Amino acid sequence: TSGYFSESIQNLEQIDSRTLNDATRIEYYAAYEWAYSMWAEYSNDKVYAPRYYEKEMLYQDSLISVLPTGSSLHNYWKGENLYRHQRYSEAEKYYQKALEGVPVNVRLYAMVTYGLALVYSKLGDWNEYEHYLIKAAISDQVCPLKENLALQELALYIFKNRSGEVSRANRYLNYSMEDAQFYNNRLRMLEIAKKFPSIVLSYQ
């Protein structure tokens, strides 16, 4: 998220996956998937982003193939894959399975609940969308990783739908920016910069 995507890929290319044990191979494919996903999001164009997304999906398929079937991680990534293929109702089922027994202070909880929020937004269920965004935002705070994507989305949702709560939306977004700056998370800072002006202007 600091912008060193090509360097990350180059480092991964130095690894011979045939020498990895099962657990390390999971981390290997997950790192590739994440790097290409973030690179595509960072590029946000019509030339390079589609190429990176294609690579991301290839490594996502590889990751799913090596995860233990029925595990929380396997169900989560199946949900992600189905979501990306616009099979939202099926994605919801896998996300819900992935959430079973996962405590709020585990990173996977935030990932799954954020995925569920996105699914419900596609299904037009805005109450559930907000419900799971809040769950994801709470988990982000419990896990000290300085990741506040859910809080950003919640701020924007409040701004657009709660005319009397602009100050709360502004507070959430400011908090997200502080965390992004703390970790020099350029991707999140760019995202916030796009949303930030309209909320700040409304608040002033």
Feature locations, PLM:
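A "functional boundary" signal
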Residues: 1-203
